[in-house]
Amino acid sequence: AEILMDLSELLEDGNKDLVIIYPGRFHPFHIGHGKVYKYLKQKYSNAKVFISTSGKVDGDRSPFTFEEKRKMMILAGVDSGAIVQTKSPYQSIEIMERFDKDKTVVVFAVSEKDMAEDPRFDFSNGLKLKKNGEPAYLQKWNSLDDAETFGTRGYIATTPTFKFKVRGQEINSASQIRNMIASSDDTMLTQMLQDLYSVTDVPQDIIDLFKNKVGNKETMNENWDEHSFSEFLKENVYEDNIMKKGILTTITEGKSPHKKGTKKYNAHMAAMH
């Protein structure tokens, strides 16, 4: 409660804005994710909370488009204005460039499971250092009092995992959901989606979506699970440079992620100046 009070006072002073980003692949987005969003809104009541996901579609592994995931998010209780399509959710440049890098603190929300499984998230010795002894860009979130704005640093905060059941079975992974859907008939599918979104009336387009993209598959791709924040960092050996340079080059130097000369590039540059 004390931290939350400090947070309110600081935000009212207008010293620093707080932005919380909840990134993920979300294939599919479900009530467990929806509860994380609600938890973040409640815990950081004066912050702007966003859900960041890409529109990348990749066969069985990533079957849903951004618009399809957006529908699932709204069904799970997410405010439509909080949903942002980003090229790389774990950088979320498209969200960050809306804010002033010297007045805004950015926190990425990561699940407890991710934090526990990856040594990169071991902040037990206080400030996380790079090999050269300098502080790393991403640090553990404590409070707004001692937080740097995202021109200098980004933060990671943990979120609890909210358990839920689908047709009496506790859900532990995305693959489990997909395998259950793949082997269900129409009645079972509707019941599963009622549990998956905690609603009594499931819109027909959502039922059709799951039926067409998941229900007609004999077996699901083994790689179907969430691509976690720790996996993102493992894939990027120079993750610290990527996080900071990717975000800051675009925002501070006015460089566009689009190819020079294209309409998108020109529009991006016009928006920057």
Residue ranges and their predicted role:
Residues 34-37, 262, 272:
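Alpha-helical and His/Cys-centered functional microenvironments
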Residues 187, 246-249, 259:
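Low-complexity intrinsically disordered segments
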Residues 1-11, 224-234, 242-248:
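Short linear clamp-binding motif
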Residues 2-223, 267:
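Nucleotidyltransferase catalytic core that binds NTPs
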Residues 223-224, 236-238, 254-261:
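Cleaved targeting-peptide boundary
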